[in-house]
Amino acid sequence: MSEVRRPSSSQPAADGAIRHDWTREEAEALYALPFPDLMFRAQSVHRRHFDPTRLETASLLSIKTGGCPEDCGYCSQSAHYDTGLKATKLMDRDTVVATAQRAKAAGAERFCMAAAWRSPKDRDLDQVCDMVSAVKDLGMETCVTLGMLTPPQAQRLKQAGLDFYNHNVDTSPEFYDRIITTRTLQDRIDTLAHVRDAGIKVCCGGIIGMGEAVDDRLGMMVLLANLGAHPDSVPINMWNEVKGVPVNDTAARPDPIALVRLIAVTRIMMPQSVVRLSAGRQYMSDELQSLCLLAGANSIFIGDVLLTTANPQADRDAALLARLGMTSALSVRPAAATAPSETADSSLVA
């Protein structure tokens, strides 16, 4: 099975050396380029580092849902808000492994496990490590997102065979305090450092559509690009409306072309990172998703649910890849024939 090619850090970047000194002004200048010029530049960078016809596919499972003590204003799993979500205990290992087996059969190459914690307790971490080892035995890449980690906890996950750790910065430094008050941005950056020091690959991105300005979206990418090492994966999530959370009061639907521009800028600034088109795809037309892939996105989540929100059905994804002439583990599955999308407005959830 072919894989998304992950270049080594020694390879030169298409627009020059890998940089960690990007400015807001440079990001804004890229974003403001005429659309054809921006897309050409992003696609040129993409082709120097990745196979542009190859898409990475991952599956996401909530192994512990709800009851989180953090007050993230977008999250259905926060105990601070009445979202109607029932908290659950940590899922047992056998159930997780069975779900991973189904995900692999459906075309997923990576299996991501998420727990709604501020930070894991050591006894819970031991169980998660067992899950990681068992999923690795299936021949899948593994990723977890468990909240903040200490250096010893990161080392323990590495010993269990963990490939990726997801810990998003969520938004720009300027907008951050309007979304979260129980965990600082520096807390997040510290955890990213612990993960990287342990030898685990970093998955780190954020959310758009919470009421932030375009400058905030670019500021988030500048923050990520100026870390000591670029994230190995950069997930870009679109805000999905959630009952009872305060972000509902500020959320604004992103313009579809603005999303494509952001992905293109991300690809140029972090040329060797896998850019994942994450939450919100169920509200995107096939045409908009195709533009996102052309701009440099090269990974998606598959499966009908992402944690607590909907996701496109796998058959729709497989049919789109077939129409585009692109490949992934998903594309080897028989795809149900579907008519071309007739969605005209490419609307996104805010």
Swiss-Prot record:
Its EC number is 2.8.1.6. Disulfide bonds: none annotated. Belongs to the radical SAM superfamily. Biotin synthase family. Keywords: 2Fe-2S, 4Fe-4S, Biotin biosynthesis, Iron, Iron-sulfur, Metal-binding, S-adenosyl-L-methionine, Transferase. One of its GO terms (molecular function) is 2 iron, 2 sulfur cluster binding. Residues 53-281 form the Radical SAM core domain. CDD domains: Radical_SAM. SMART domains: BATS, Elp3. This is Biotin synthase. One of its GO terms (biological process) is biotin biosynthetic process. Homodimer. [2Fe-2S] cluster binds at C112, C143, C203, R276. The keyword Transit peptide does not apply. Its cofactor is [4Fe-4S] cluster; [2Fe-2S] cluster. Binds 1 [4Fe-4S] cluster. The cluster is coordinated with 3 cysteines and an exchangeable S-adenosyl-L-methionine. [4Fe-4S] cluster binds at C68, C72, C75. Pathway: Cofactor biosynthesis; biotin biosynthesis; biotin from 7,8-diaminononanoate: step 2/2. It catalyses: (4R,5S)-dethiobiotin + (sulfur carrier)-SH + 2 reduced [2Fe-2S]-[ferredoxin] + 2 S-adenosyl-L-methionine = (sulfur carrier)-H + biotin + 2 5'-deoxyadenosine + 2 L-methionine + 2 oxidized [2Fe-2S]-[ferredoxin]. Catalyzes the conversion of dethiobiotin (DTB) to biotin by the insertion of a sulfur atom into dethiobiotin via a radical-based mechanism.
